[in-house]
Structure formats: structure tokens, C-alpha cells
Amino acid sequence: MSAIVDIIGREVLDSRGNPTVECDVLLESGVMGRAAVPSGASTGSREAIELRDGDKGRYLGKGVLKAVEHINTEISEAIMGLDASEQAFLDRTLIDLDGTENKGRLGANAMLAVSMAVAKAAAEEAGLPLYRYFGGSGAMQLPVPMMNIVNGGAHANNSLDIQEFMVMPVSQTSFREALRCGAEIFHALKKILADKGMSTAVGDEGGFAPNFSSNEECLNTIVQAIEKAGYRAGEDVLLALDCAASEFYHEAEGVYQLEGEGLKLSSTQFADYLANLCDKFPIVSIEDGMAEGDWDGWKTLTDKLGKRVQLVGDDLFVTNTKILKEGIEKGIGNSILIKINQIGTLTETFAAIEMAKRAGYTAVISHRSGETEDSTIADIAVGTNAGQIKTGSLSRSDRMAKYNQLLRIEEDLGDIASYPGKGAFYNLR
């Protein structure tokens, strides 16, 4: 039995210099698991609650000492002595202990740190790499990365309304070569921006954040960078967007306001706007193309683009099986973004991935804009054979930690490692 004998929660800092929760779980055998949780900037209203202290005199109210205290007291008492290999039972214990629908009492940040640390300790105890512990012998597929090379919206201080412009290398036969492709495009883009006298400063997720006059200008520049790096847009590399449309949706008026372009659009008009971009550029994936509460708009977008473009629900589904089930039944979107801190335990995370796959939806494993050096999501991506990962640009060590872990996993898998390329979009025609 892998009995838990000690649990230590602590406050550490994330990639934005804000406090977050880290947890150590020690087992009877002496092995330890350590995990740190991320934090988002643009968040869905139905995400599990991240517990913050609210003391404005300390870290501007963003301290997490209450969450840490919950780990070191209540949670510790509840799971001390339990078997770390019983992940589902441990997570259910945490959920029952919290007793709320949104994990607002103990805090999803406290619960997730414990859930992850327990899994890492159990994997160590079993002598297995984490991806293998999660997925067993069937875990062998590396994910296609969504590489966020231009940041806008809530992730940058510029004129772009769309939050993320991403490249997805798809013609390569290994993750290593896909990563090289993305890195070369990133550096080609930096040179193009510098030559134009545009900013090469990076945003929260490591992408550039220059002031483009329009979304089309940004996309054209990315296509130039792909070609400058020696690749073919539409063949070797596809494009992806994260609109984060909830951030510029005005519910009272029912309009999407693209301030950077001086546009006010209805849901139908915004769906047409996105369809026009897909006609002009090799866009294979659009995340949060409509606001989380605009389900009619989502239905319009899905009917218009859902057979040829991956439509990913992030704020829409918030990694929640109840909401995802409703979306599947109504034919909303065709993919879910998986963010472990939106739901707060690994068991619930895996349930959302499984539900998506059974319905023919894709699942994209994702970081948050406020990250840490923790690379668990890389192991989740391979352990679940998700096929896609979204973990930032080709700069900032908090993003590189995930990419480098995927390189290690691919090396560990050896000849049985596979890279899906365009096959990652198994539900598109």
C-alpha cells in the first residue's frame, strides 16, 4: 500500500509573479510527488473557484495562504494514510470534503495541487513515468502542438482583439521535428517584425505582441514567417485561433465589438467574419469563437464551420462533463479545451477527455496564461492519447518545460512513439 504519510502545501509564484499553490505528498516508502497549479487571465464564469486571500495589502489581494492552510489542515487530515494509487477515491474524498458545486470552499487550486501531487507520488512509487502511470501500455501518441506565436486580447497590451494566433506543424513524422518547425517559424517571425520596426516583446504566453492594424494583417505576417522558415502554409503548417470571444462580447447589445477594427457584429455576422478568415487562410481550429453564454451563436458557428474547422470550447465547457454533455446533445462545437484547474481534480479531467472522445469530439490539453515549471499536462497529453496540446510559444521557460518534457517522453517511447499530424483532427472532413 502506498500510504500517504505527509502533505505540505506552500505558496509559490507563477510566471506572472502572482502567488499560486504548490503541494508535496510524501508516501510511506519515502517517495514524494510535487505539483504546482496554474492560473488563467481570461476565465470562464463557470470554472471551479480559485481561492485567493483578498488581502489587498499582500500581493494585491492575490495571496493563496487560505488555500495552503486548507491543504495543511483539513485536506491533510482527510487523506492522511490513504493509498495514493487510489486516485479516483482520493479525488472523491476531496470533492466530498469541499462540499460545494464549484469547489469554492477549499479552493480548486488547493484541491488540484493535492490531486496532482498524489498522482506523481503514486507514479514514482510504481516506478513508472507519469504518462505511463496515467495511460498504461497504450500511451504512445505525442500531441500536435498549438503554438501561440502572436498574443492579443487579454494576454497582451496591443490592438488585436483575437487573443491567440497559433501555428500547428502537421506534416512532420515526430514531435521533435514539429517542435523544430515551430521554433524556426517563431524566429522567422521575430526577424520579420524587427525588420518592420514592430515590437518583438512577448506576452504572457511567450508570443509576440505587436500592434497590427487588423487580424488579417497578423495572419498574413504569420504566413510570411512560415514561408520564410522554409515551410508551406496549409501543407506543413496549419493555423489556429483563440478568439476568447467572451472578452469582447457585449451581452446587453448582443454584439461582438472588435475595437481594433472598429466593428460591431451580431453573432451571425461574427460567424461570417470567422468563416471569411477560414476561406482566406489555412485555419484548422478556432477556440471560443463565440461567447460562453451565446449558445445560439455557437450553434450558428458550428452549423457554418463545424465540418471543416475544429471548434474548441474553453470558456464554453470549462472542462466540466455536465456542461460538455449538454453541448454534445445540442450539437455545439466539436472539441473541448482541457484545463486541469478549471475543474480541480485529475479524475474529473480524465472524465471530460473520455466523454469528448466517445462523442467524436477532440480534446486539446492546455496550459494557462499564468504557468509554473510543472509539466504534468505534457504527461496528461500523452497518457490520454489526446493528440493535441496547447502550451504557449517558443519562449519562456514555463512554456518550454512542457515542450521539453514531451521531447523526453518521445525519447522514452522510442520506436513506438507516434505523431498524428493532420490525423489529430479526426472529426473533420
Swiss-Prot record:
The keyword Ribosomal protein does not apply. Pathway: Carbohydrate degradation; glycolysis; pyruvate from D-glyceraldehyde 3-phosphate: step 4/5. GO terms for molecular function: magnesium ion binding; phosphopyruvate hydratase activity. Keywords: Cytoplasm, Glycolysis, Lyase, Magnesium, Metal-binding, Secreted. It is found in: Cytoplasm; Secreted; Cell surface. PROSITE patterns: ENOLASE. Its cofactor is Mg(2+). InterPro entries: Enolase (IPR000941), Enolase-like_C_sf (IPR036849), Enolase-like_N (IPR029017), Enolase_C (IPR020810), Enolase_CS (IPR020809), Enolase_N (IPR020811). GO terms for cellular component: cell surface; extracellular region; phosphopyruvate hydratase complex. Its EC number is 4.2.1.11. Binds a second Mg(2+) ion via substrate during catalysis. Mg(2+) binds at D242, E287, D314. It catalyses: (2R)-2-phosphoglycerate = phosphoenolpyruvate + H2O. (2R)-2-phosphoglycerate binds at Q163, K339, R368, S369, K390. The active site is at E205, K339. One of its GO terms (biological process) is glycolytic process. It comes from the Bacteria. Catalyzes the reversible conversion of 2-phosphoglycerate (2-PG) into phosphoenolpyruvate (PEP). It is essential for the degradation of carbohydrates via glycolysis. Belongs to the enolase family. This is Enolase.
